[in-house]
A protein has these predicted regions:
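Activity-critical C-terminal alpha-helical subdomain
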Residues: 132-133
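An amphipathic, hydrophobic-aromatic interaction surface with interspersed Lys/Arg
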Residues: 122-129
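Short, 15-30-residue, compositionally biased linear elements
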Residues: 118-120
Length: 148
């Protein structure tokens, strides 16, 4: 079994290599791969992960276990949903949410947002960011400078 310290070191190394250059150059701290630390400091109210069941990278499973340690002692709330993959019905998707206590409402709001019919829009992107804990100025910048 890998120690928590060794795993954290491997995880930090993976973070540096996984973040896209575009995200690293944003003028604010991007939450991606920093969710747990931000949540434990009270700076992020909600984390959301989605993967195909059975195809989760080991690094993700290990990261979720780190969250689950805090769920076990009441620092975080966890909700998991498994649904048919929208584009490949034989596959299943896991939607995994972690929220700070008192912010469980964000999970329900995020599920409503993700299940809204119609094309993804700037308004939906903004609400997505707000639910995850990004500030208005950060969402403004993202919407102005994102591509694709």
């Amino acid at each position: 079994m890998v120690s928590t310290r060794a795993y954290a070191a491997r995880y930090r190394f993976a973070i540096r290599n996984m973040l896209a250059e575009r995200l690293r150059q944003l003028p604010y701290l991007v939450h991606t791969n920093r969710e747990l630390g931000l949540m434990l400091r009270g700076m992020k109210p909600l984390a959301y992960f989605m993967n195909v069941v059975g195809r989760e990278p080991d690094i993700c499973i290990g990261y979720w276990r780190m969250f689950d340690r805090h769920v076990a002692v009441g620092r975080l709330i966890r909700r998991e949903m498994i649904e048919a993959h929208p584009d490949q019905p034989p596959l299943a998707c896991r939607k995994l949410f972690y929220a700070l206590p008192g912010h469980e409402w964000r999970i329900d709001a995020m599920l409503m947002l993700l299940n809204e019919p119609g094309a993804w829009s700037d308004d939906r992107e903004r609400r997505f960011g707000e639910l995850l804990g990004y500030e208005q100025r950060q969402n403004d910048h993202w919407l102005t400078h994102r591509t694709g």
